[in-house]
Every structure is written in structure tokens, then in C-alpha cells.
């Protein structure tokens, strides 16, 4: 639905030009007027800050030239601050672009926002129902009702929900069991993390009136660096897929992990269940390792220090050891995990824990940022397996020019899924379910967890 824009984008018949009009007289939380040119600035920031989201927007005419420092602006975006008109020209038709315009990556920000620096502790002003009023990363963050959100509502964004509470304080606590105890004792109102496996049955049984399971569209997998030994050998990668036991990993999650062996998760267009590597089959896995006979058997296994993820890493480390590798487990802090393993200068990023949650409801979101060769970035990369398969990239690019509703497109995405798994670029093992658990003072029935954006903070309400 339209938010800051007056209506959904007007798309040219050839699918290469998108036109929008910004609503009039809207302001950011600090009182700065929201201008059409702020959209251009927001997209430019993605490339200057090496954002992992930049890969979505390189389909805009001139984006690559701007990213390479060959242009001062992105020529495919033109705006008029007087009329609010925004025109975006693409290099070709793109079946996902309407979704991309709704992502937080492209949310307008004023030009006073740092172009190429970290804004964690100095967040830009907000245009939504809440603003970030204080940050002490990574310990605390405070969100308060945006005093200027009325200008957005008055401009016509009537369908965008307003906040029910005046203030939300977020406090870091990596001990998930302690989080549960705090909610039970009504010291905390909500936990972002799912209820841990060792407390799940207790919470389900004793606090059923304020607990529920939540569906989520995601895939958990082990990445394998396909550009260096031993994972540059497909037989080694296939062996890992045969050896991994999704049910063993499900036990780590307390039964919240639905087993899988593919890229696309249930609920995503193009999903068709299949299993190329029936198992777990350690005999088959060891046979493939013997056939590959890798000369380099020294492997560093990466994971972060969140309890479930650490246990996943320990499981994977033990599995690789059983397969005859000299595996070293490297556990690092969760708040730097993705930037560390997504940096090509980080040594020994061989294999490890990874997951991906949908950015938007289109299968390209599970292929382009994670498996396209163009997504192998120097920093903030999400193609952790360094997959670079030109034939499959070409198919991915071809599908991008079509709409997901076009005849046969969903089937082609299902075929693309299988083609990547025939190359065993990942070892997927599960799709996680989440939880909502609230304190007694919260209105449980009003609380809403969005399938895409997770907890809707505007739905929080005190009884």
C-alpha cells in the first residue's frame, strides 16, 4: 500500500520506468520537510556505505557508474521537489522493483545524513510512527512516538498505523532464558528472540494465554566457500549435504525448525519440496569425501555466540571432524558476525552458520543477494559461498525481467532452486518458526507479528 507516496507506482508498458508522487507537506521527526530528492540521496547512500542492500538497486540506470565513482549522481533517478514527482528508469524490466521501493533501504532520508559513514549512534530522523530518540549501541535504544507523524497522516497516509504506546525501550540481553524470566515476572514486556528450547515447553504450558508460535519465511544453511579448497570440489559439498541431520539441528531449536534441503522456504512463490540428498547418510558422505580426497583438510567453521547458533556451530564442527577434516570452530560476537564473514579480507572464512529472512515476497530475494556472482562484494557481502555460476546467473537475470504471475515463472524458480542445490552451493537444513511472548500487562490480542517485518511495534498496547 502507498505510504509516503500518494499511490502505487505508475509503470510504463515496457516495465522500465516507474513514476511516483510524494505526498505534500510531510516532515521528518526533527521537523525537516520530506522532499522527493531525499529518495535519490537514500539510494546513493546504499552504494557509498557499501550496504548489502545496494545489490537490489543496481538495476537503476546509472547506479553502477555512480557506485564505481564515474558519476556524481544516479542518472536514472530524477525528482522535482516542487511537485513531489519521482521518476526511476531501469536498465530493463524488473519483476521485483515494486517490492524494492517498499524496503527500508530506499526510505527517504534528509541530505544531512552521513553519506558514507556509520549512523548507528546518530540515526537519521524518522518518517514513520516512531523515531529513535536515543542509542547507546549495542546496549540500549529508545524509540518514542514521532511528533511529526501527524503530517504524514494528514497528507493522506491513513492506512499506515499509528503508535499505541508513547515509548519503547530496547535493552540488550543475550541470555534468552533470563529474558523469559523477566517476562514471566513482568519486568520486561516483549523479547525479540524466540523462547529458547529449554524453556519452550514451560512457556507453552504455563503461559499459553500470552504465548504463540509465529510463522516466518527463512532458510537456515551452512555456507561453503566454493572458491577455495576443499569446498571448490562439488563432491565435498555434496558430502556435507548428505551428512547433515536436520532433525538433530531441530532438537537444538526445541522443535521450532522445520527440516529442509533447499534454497526457497515454504510460503515463498516457487517453493516446491524436494530432497536431492536423502539422509543423513554418513556412509555416502564418507564415500564422496574419499573420492574427492581433498589435499587441504584444514577448515575453519564460523558461527556467532548466540546460544542456538553456537550449538549449531558445535554440531557442524563435530560433523566435519567425523568426515575426516581438521576443523577449528571460531565463535565470534553476534553483533559483528555478518560484517566479519561478509568481508573478503577476513582470513579463513571456509564454512559456517548462515540464515536468510525474506526482504520481500519474491524468490529473487533468496537468489540474487545470496548466490549471484555480482553479489560477491568486498565488504558486507551476503554471497558467503562465493557462488559464481554464470549460466544460473543468466537464468536468474532472465527471470527478473518477468512478473512472478507470468505463466511458468514460479516453476522456473523452482527449477533454479534445484539447479543450485545440484551444485550443492549450500547445505540447507531448516526453516525456523518464531514466538511471541508478552508480559501480563500487554494486550496480547492486539500484538501482531508481520510475516515479513516481524514484530509490528505499532501494535503494542498496554491493557
Predicted regions span which residues?
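Short helices/loops that flank or line small-molecule/ion binding pockets
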Residues: 31-32, 38, 177-189, 206, ...
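Surface-exposed binding/hinge segments that line
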Residues: 19-21, 33, 38-40, 48, ...
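Bilobed periplasmic-binding protein-like "clamshell/Venus-flytrap" ligand-binding domains
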Residues: 95-101, 291-308, 348-355, 402-440
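Append "and occasionally in soluble cytosolic enzymes with long acidic Gly/Pro-rich linkers
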Residues: 144, 232-323, 328, 386, ...
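Alpha-helical secondary-structure segments
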Residues: 35-42, 83-87, 128-129, 162-167, ...
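Periplasmic binding protein-like
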Residues: 31, 321-374, 408-412
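Extracellular/periplasmic solute-recognition and catalytic clefts
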Residues: 133-144, 169-228
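Short, solvent-exposed loop/beta-turn-alpha elements that line the ligand-binding surface or hinge
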Residues: 1-13, 63-66, 103-134, 148, ...
Amino acid at each position: 500500500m502507498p505510504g509516503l507516496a500518494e499511490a502505487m507506482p505508475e509503470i510504463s508498458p515496457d516495465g522500465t520506468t516507474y513514476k511516483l508522487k510524494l505526498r505534500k507537506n510531510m516532515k521528518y521527526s526533527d521537523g525537516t520537510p520530506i522532499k522527493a530528492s531525499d529518495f535519490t540521496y537514500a539510494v546513493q547512500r546504499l552504494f557509498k556505505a557499501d550496504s548489502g542492500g545496494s545489490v537490489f538497486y543496481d538495476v537503476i540506470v546509472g547506479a553502477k557508474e555512480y557506485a564505481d565513482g564515474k558519476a556524481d549522481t544516479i542518472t536514472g533517478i530524477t525528482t522535482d521537489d516542487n511537485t513531489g514527482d519521482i521518476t526511476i528508469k531501469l536498465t530493463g524490466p524488473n519483476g521485483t522493483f515494486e517490492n524494492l521501493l517498499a524496503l527500508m533501504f530506499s526510505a527517504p532520508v534528509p541530505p544531512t545524513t552521513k553519506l558514507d559513514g556509520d549512523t548507528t549512534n546518530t540515526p537519521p530522523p524518522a518518517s514513520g510512527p516512531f523515531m529513535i530518540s536515543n542509542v547507546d549501541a549495542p546496549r540500549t535504544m529508545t524509540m518514542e512516538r514521532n511528533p511529526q507523524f501527524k503530517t504524514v497522516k494528514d497528507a493522506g497516509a491513513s492506512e499506515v498505523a499509528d503508535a499505541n504506546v508513547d515509548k519503547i525501550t530496547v535493552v540488550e540481553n543475550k541470555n534468552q532464558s533470563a529474558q523469559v524470566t523477566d517476562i514471566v515476572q513482568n519486568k520486561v514486556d516483549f523479547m525479540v528472540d524466540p523462547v529458547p528450547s529449554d524453556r519452550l515447553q514451560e512457556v507453552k504450558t504455563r503461559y499459553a494465554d500470552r504465548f504463540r508460535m509465529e510463522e516466518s519465511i527463512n532458510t537456515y544453511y551452512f555456507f561453503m566457500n566454493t572458491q577455495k579448497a576443499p569446498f571448490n570440489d562439488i563432491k565435498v559439498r555434496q558430502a556435507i549435504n548428505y551428512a547433515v541431520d536436520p532433525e538433530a539441528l531441530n532438537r537444538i531449536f526445541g522443535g521450532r525448525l522445520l527440516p529442509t534441503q533447499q534454497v526457497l522456504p515454504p510460503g515463498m512463490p516457487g517453493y516446491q519440496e524436494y530432497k536431492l540428498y536423502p539422509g543423513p547418510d554418513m556412509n555416502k558422505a564418507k564415500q564422496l569425501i574419499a573420492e574427492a580426497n581433498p589435499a587441504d583438510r584444514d577448515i575453519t567453521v564460523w558461527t556467532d555466540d548466540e546460544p542456538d547458533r553456537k550449538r549449531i556451530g558445535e554440531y557442524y564442527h563435530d560433523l566435519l571432524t567425523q568426515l575426516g577434516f581438521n576443523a577449528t570452530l571460531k565463535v565470534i560476537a553476534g553483533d559483528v558476525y555478518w560484517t566479519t564473514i561478509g568481508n573478503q579480507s577476513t582470513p579463513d572464512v571456509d564454512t559456517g552458520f548462515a540464515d536468510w529472512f525474506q526482504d520481500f515476497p519474491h524468490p529473487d530475494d533468496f537468489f540474487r543477494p545470496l548466490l549471484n556472482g555480482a553479489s560477491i562484494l568486498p565488504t558486507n557481502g551476503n554471497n558467503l559461498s562465493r557462488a559464481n555460476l554464470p549460466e544460473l546467473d543468466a537464468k536468474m537475470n532472465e527471470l527478473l525481467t518477468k512478473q512472478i504471475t507470468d505463466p511458468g515463472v514460479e516453476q522456473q524458480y523452482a527449477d533454479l532452486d534445484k539447479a543450485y542445490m545440484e551444485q550443492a552451493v549450500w547445505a540447507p537444513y531448516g526453516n525456523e518458526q518464531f514466538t511471541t511472548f508478552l508480559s501480563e500487562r500487554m494486550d496480547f490480542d492486539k500484538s501482531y507479528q508481520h510475516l515479513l517485518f516481524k514484530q509490528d511495534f505499532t501494535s503494542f498496547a498496554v491493557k
